[in-house]
Amino acid sequence: MAGNTIGQLFRVTTFGESHGLALGCIVDGVPPGIPLTEADLQHDLDRRRPGTSRYTTQRREPDQVKILSGVFEGVTTGTSIGLLIENTDQRSQDYGAIKDLFRPGHADYTYEQKYGLRDYRGGGRSSARETAMRVAAGAIAKKYLAAKFGIVIRGCLTQMGDIPLAIKDWDQVEQNPFFCPDPDKIDALDELMRGLKKEGDSIGAKVTVVADGVPPGLGEPVFDRLDADIAHALMSINAVKGVEIGDGFEVVKLRGSENRDEITKAGFQSNHAGGILGGISSGQQIVANIALKPTSSITVPGHTINRFGEEVEMITKGRHDPCVGIRAVPIAEAMLAIVLMDHFMRQRAQNGDVTTTIPRW
């Protein structure tokens, strides 16, 4: 199975399945001399881990990360960093009844078509459980980018179903179980989630992730444009069906005179481009949105076929998220951090000595 690695100089390779013994990853390209402990990684893992509220899956995994290599006496050595998280709360028996069925909306059918077999326990490698290691690796990138360049990466839920959520207060995001930046909508989200759990159904969501403090110059035209790599990274997250950079699909409504981000001595007058022009960071805030589909693991009966080609009705039992968008927030942050870290290293390798007299804001 290929496709387990992202990045060129800052490289993250993950392994493991939902109901396997453990999840792990190898992080290559981490600069030496960075203070790093397991506690530095645990904060974001705790934000992502299951079972932390009644609105997410009740699979209870502590997600305690272990640093196996690449750190000596509390600092990175420049060698590969090995990370491991043990699975402790698998309930594989929940999936015995569907081992021969293809869950509609899941990767069961496509995995079996591709490989001729599949791990039916919790989706195996296709499960979002794999993203725990992305978050751990992303925490390394976030720490370095913040300490070295003052870059702040943060995300929030900006829509659930038909409820839009304005970014009113970033401080509120960590104060509620929805990563919601609009305190006036918490009750509406709670009511929606309670109704979904009662019905045994699920709902889609939109997540926004931003990076402040990114300097101009990151991105490798033409095929490794910064926005192309960000879209690639975000699109690789489970359940993501759409990615927008800046205004995204809203630009189809605008005229060129409205969409262009005009520049004065005071700086850019707007940011429709989401901080990226020509595939290169402009120095403005980088903004990306992702759309996540409603999970298909629901107790509402649905139609499918089994491995023998017979039509059957099925209900997906187990412990699942009514809205996968909630726990996607720290995952999106991690993927943006990984891409920015990789492009920082690539920029430094080729253009580390480049200086200009062009203003920066």
UniProtKB/Swiss-Prot annotation:
A molecular function (GO) term: chorismate synthase activity
InterPro entries in UniProt: Chorismate_synth (IPR000453), Chorismate_synth_AroC_sf (IPR035904), Chorismate_synthase_CS (IPR020541)
Residues at which NADP(+) binds: R48, R54
Catalytic activity, EC: 4.2.3.5
Pathway: Metabolic intermediate biosynthesis; chorismate biosynthesis; chorismate from D-erythrose 4-phosphate and phosphoenolpyruvate: step 7/7
Disulfide bridges in this chain: none
Keyword Amino-acid biosynthesis attributed: yes
Necessary cofactors: FMNH2
One BP annotation, GO: chorismate biosynthetic process
Catalytic activity, reaction form: 5-O-(1-carboxyvinyl)-3-phosphoshikimate = chorismate + phosphate
UniProtKB keywords: Amino-acid biosynthesis, Aromatic amino acid biosynthesis, FAD, Flavoprotein, FMN, Lyase, NADP
A GO CC term attached to the entry: cytosol
Domain of life the protein comes from: Bacteria
Top EC class, one word: lyase
Cofactor note: Reduced FMN (FMNH(2)).
Pfam families (alphabetical): Chorismate_synt
Residues reported to bind FMN: R125, S126, S127, N238, A239, G278, K293, P294, T295, S296, S297, R319
UniProt subunit comment: Homotetramer.
Stated family: Belongs to the chorismate synthase family.
Function: This reaction introduces a second double bond into the aromatic ring system.
HAMAP family xrefs: Chorismate_synth (MF_00300)
Name this protein carries in UniProt: Chorismate synthase
Gene (name only): aroC
